[in-house]
């Protein structure tokens, strides 16, 4: 197997830059810089030389096979974070036989291949690297720490027990089986189905935390939607004008709201129009507003809600509070009056939705659990009917087991890896 190397830290000027090596020649590659090797897991300062020239002073760390991130013999070189120092060491490594620059995500791929991580942990690491908010970080850390693997292993153990009991009735069909195993199998399946359904519900919330919530600002033309968006975003994200119908397309602004990733949507004003371009913008506004997690209905002077019927958590807000007396929740994007109260109301509603978040954070997790549920429900129905053909119920349990195994990458893993590792840098 090749020994791979890459810059593991971000490019650019910094205090420290970290180079990572993994593979059978990792130690020899470090020694090629004319340094004595430190003990494993002991950092040591060494002067790196190449062709008689000092390249840099660096901290060297070695990791033994089976006790590193990748599971292979590995090394880290902590350099001064100058582009020139990093470039000189990378150039030297490229001249060594048996070494090559790592592909994107290849260190993590080797950790997966060597059993250091399961597929769900790899996804958790990808989410951790992409996390923007505290809620995303906490959720990604739960997945990266192995929460999905541990839970799946418990489910798998119970399912294997149920399958083994059912297989026994097939293997000894011509003999007297001393105990009727059907009640125990039914009980195991009922508990598993209940657990998985609860996790499916929680996964929908977890997906929203991972991807971010969408909040649409809707209302009549010139109600102040774009001004409100700018006030919430604390920057000029949308063009504002006294001319009604200025906003034609949906404007998106990503922000951190109370530790949650939120995308605010400024939409076209809702009204009857003969302008085909404006009509298209209104259609898009209604489509995005319906799909949003929450809507802010910004009222104009008429005080009428337009376009859609508000749902339970939606906020109805009186706009342009600086120009007239208002009741209830009201805001002024120009003066900032009421903005903090609106932000707090949004936070309360969105945080309440995260209370039921589970550990399963991706659509593929939810779909795999739903496949397992369907297969187990099919087996359970047959058991309730007396199992005239137990081999059919046993096949359902095998399908359920395969669905659970796909959660952690025991099966069907190759098709997913390209998509997952496409978001990794070469040093990860």
Swiss-Prot record:
Binds 1 potassium ion per subunit. Its main location: cytoplasm. Keywords: Cytoplasm, GTP-binding, Hydrolase, Magnesium, Metal-binding, Nucleotide-binding, Potassium, tRNA processing. One of its GO terms (cellular component) is cytoplasm. Its EC number is 3.6.-.-. It holds the Pfam family MnmE_helical. It comes from the Bacteria. Belongs to the TRAFAC class TrmE-Era-EngA-EngB-Septin-like GTPase superfamily. TrmE GTPase family. Homodimer. Heterotetramer of two MnmE and two MnmG subunits. Exhibits a very high intrinsic GTPase hydrolysis rate. Involved in the addition of a carboxymethylaminomethyl (cmnm) group at the wobble position (U34) of certain tRNAs, forming tRNA-cmnm(5)s(2)U34. NCBIfam families: PRK05291.1-3 (NF003661), small_GTP (TIGR00231). This is tRNA modification GTPase MnmE. The gene is mnmE.
